[in-house]
């Protein structure tokens, strides 16, 4: 995005890539489908998802937001569709569609691409210590430039080449780097029964975390059971907070399977269900409420005799079942780490970036974009939109900044 925009305005651009090909990380986004953005067109509402960091980004998104991003990709021939929670995907359901469009864009603008070329250092000018003069490659070759844009990403999914290289270069020249940690990462669970449900996904689940019986955070959305524990948007969005809590002791993750119904409403629902089931055994009665694999585990957790007929379940047992459906306690073990994280937290301190241009406040001809910035955001298209927005604004600003 940034390279293409700079070249589009007439500058000579060299795009340096450490890998043997461009776009390795883009190809795995959204499970290989590429969650391009989120179709929230109100900038203020969009940036609320970035919590406290949103205030830094308003001037950036005012220049190039969701609307402009979709127009950009549509002009490149990428058809899109909107799915649950306003997530935008290419109609092809393939990240390759997006990558191919971007490659076509930069090639049309005659961007020079240098592959297999790891950078080791950012060069500062000998005559002006507040000016960047270029970069040094691993082979010791120096590439000089009037403007340098750093888009190396964070430390998540290192197999794609995202190993935090840029943090080291920027530290050397005086930038403050907040230590990166995995963010939007699946969670390993201690309870063995969870792993029996691997592959099962549930929508609209309320998640609440507890530590020492004290409520911590809540969220709602889709969860996915895996062979190691829990994933899915709702879990990923709370993973950073869960990771912090785990430093201080055990964390309980409570699942409310029916967040839109209070205990009384759910009790009535189960009463009616048991009346209909009547002589049916309890162990076979919950399949209409939840997927059968989960229903079997709930039967075990409830401690109600599975052979009991529904019309013989006592009031106390039924109320206890309601409590379970509204509060399934699960013991968190650990976050899975950078190799499974979608993004990383940490990065360049935001006070050292001019968000009107994405330029460094220490070096006005150095631009910092995307995941290299210390900006937390949820899953759902927000990470890629941050990249598109900061990339375009940085590219645009190289023309404005002399």
What are these regions (language model features)?
Residues 115-131:
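A conserved short coil-to-beta-strand element within the FAD-binding core of flavoproteins
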């Amino acid at each position: 995005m940034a390279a293409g925009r700079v070249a589009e305005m007439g500058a000579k651009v060299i795009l340096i890539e450490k890998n043997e090909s461009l776009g390795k990380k883009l190809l795995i986004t959204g499970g290989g489908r590429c969650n391009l953005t989120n179709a929230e067109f109100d900038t203020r509402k969009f940036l609320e998802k970035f919590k406290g960091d949103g205030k830094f980004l308003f001037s950036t998104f005012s220049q190039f937001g969701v609307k402009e991003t979709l127009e950009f990709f549509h002009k490149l021939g990428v058809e899109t569709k909107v799915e649950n929670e306003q997530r935008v995907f290419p109609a092809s359901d393939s990240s390759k569609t997006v990558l191919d469009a971007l490659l076509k864009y930069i090639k049309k603008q005659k961007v020079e691409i240098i592959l297999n070329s790891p950078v080791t250092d950012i060069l500062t000018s000998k005559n002006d210590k507040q000016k960047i003069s270029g970069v040094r490659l691993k082979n010791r070759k120096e590439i000089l430039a009037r403007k340098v844009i750093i888009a190396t990403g964070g430390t998540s999914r290192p197999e794609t080449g995202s190993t935090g290289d840029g943090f080291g270069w920027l530290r050397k020249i005086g930038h403050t780097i907040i230590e990166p940690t995995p963010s939007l990462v699946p969670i390993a669970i201690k309870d063995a029964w969870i792993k029996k449900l691997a592959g099962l996904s549930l929508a609209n689940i309320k998640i609440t975390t507890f530590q020492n019986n004290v409520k911590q955070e809540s969220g709602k959305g889709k969860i996915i059971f895996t062979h190691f524990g829990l994933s899915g948007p709702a879990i990923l969005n709370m993973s950073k907070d869960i990771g912090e809590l785990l430093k201080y002791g055990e964390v309980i993750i409570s699942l409310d399977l029916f967040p839109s119904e209070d205990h009384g409403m759910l009790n009535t629902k189960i009463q009616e269900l048991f009346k209909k089931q009547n002589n049916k055994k309890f162990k076979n009665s919950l399949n209409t409420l939840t997927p059968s694999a989960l229903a079997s585990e709930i039967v075990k957790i409830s401690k109600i005799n599975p052979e009991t007929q529904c019309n013989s379940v006592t009031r106390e047992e039924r109320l206890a079942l309601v409590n379970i459906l509204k509060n399934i306690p699960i013991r968190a073990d650990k976050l899975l780490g950078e190799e499974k994280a979608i993004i990383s937290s940490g990065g360049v301190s935001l006070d050292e970036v001019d968000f009107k241009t994405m330029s460094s406040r220490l070096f006005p001809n150095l631009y910092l974009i995307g995941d290299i910035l210390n900006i937390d955001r949820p899953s759902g298209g927000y990470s890629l939109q941050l990249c598109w927005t900061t990339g375009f604004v940085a590219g645009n600003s190289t023309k404005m900044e002399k």
